[in-house]
Amino acid sequence: YLLRGYADDLNLQDWLEHYIFPREDRLDGRAVKAASTLAIAEALRFGTTSVSDMYYFCDEICQAVAESGIKANISRGMSMFLGDDFCFDTFPACRELVELKDKWHNHDNGRIKIEASIHAEYTSTYQLWDALAEYAVNNGLQLQVHLSETKKEHDACVEKYGLTPAQVLDCHRVFDVPVVAAHCVHVTQEDMQLLAKRHVSAAHCPVSNLKLASGCADVLGMVKAGMNVCLGTDSVASNNNLDLFEEIKAAALMAKGKTGDPKALPAEAALMMATVCGARAQGRSAECGVIELGMDADLILLDFNQPHLIPCHNVLSHLVYAASGHDVALTMVRGKILYADGKYPTLDIAGALKELHDYAIPRVFSDGPEAQA
């Protein structure tokens, strides 16, 4: 959240290695708590009722989620490079995962779910894949991973192993549990068949993929193969906002532009990716994703009485092609109002903003010794 607008107009590798990772090294739990509170506020403002997040200092993230009332699937991002000594029981990130699962998994009747994670094939090694896959299976956890986001990443894996990232991870049982694979921009047709067989959900992030020039995911191909495809924003650092309505429209337009078919990914299908398919990917199909008797009252209201939404010949069309998160007037989770008309009844926005300006931003962006303490 702190890195919104810090590094734009770059490819993924330059963006990560030269800008994002170095600043993330300066984060601490206090900074992440303030940033997470504001990120949740932004998500609620734009009508998101449930999120998935892979990051660091997840105990503080869970605290913010618990206070806010939003639903969340949280995973501690895991990376490990060759040469690192590895033992699951002593590896710091794995110990954090265990503590996180013991403390927060299924908190508040499942409003918070803890998941395992592998940042990506190219930022980790087989020892980590094996250990996390085993832990996820034994503890009934889902798993998050970034998969084939760029052509460079995908091709390097094929050159190294003779297999695609999806095939390599499958060899190490990573897909033995429900997995959400972010991006899937360069997965092959064979990958799609494999991922569908393993019930892997793809989190399509069209705005981030376009902004980083990573490519255009073959959403129609994945759906045709039988994959569940939902939507994500990736992050404010690569997007640069959390407005899921932008993703809905971008996904529909990208599919049409990629195929040359104006009927590709029609409005209803694009909207389902943000609702039904998202709930399915999070393992929440029994509680949300549709408005139906017996489901949680996870609802949003939009103000259609505005010049850019008049006249309304087709509600679905407006939701996909004309509306934005700024049109959301109310966001409710489990029947509790979390955002309404500019107010956040469960969040201390002023306090979080003060923390961000007084502590988090100086810590991450000041080059003095206090920033690295």
Predicted regions and their residues:
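Active-site gating loops and adjacent loop-to-helix segments of metal-dependent hydrolytic enzymes
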Residues: 2-33, 71-94, 150-178, 198-201, ...
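Divalent metal-coordination and catalytic microenvironments
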Residues: 3, 47, 65, 116, ...
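Alpha-helical scaffold segments that flank or form the walls of functional sites
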Residues: 4-70, 93-109, 355-365, 369
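Alpha-helical segments flanking ligand/cofactor-binding loops in enzyme cores
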Residues: 41, 63, 130, 134, ...
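Metal-coordinating catalytic core of metallo-dependent amide/deamination hydrolases
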Residues: 60-190
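His/Asp/Glu-enriched, well-ordered alpha-helical/loop segment
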Residues: 171-178, 220-306, 320-323
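Helical hairpin unit composed of two closely spaced alpha helices linked by a short loop
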Residues: 190, 211-213
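Active-site microenvironment of metallo-dependent hydrolases
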Residues: 275-373
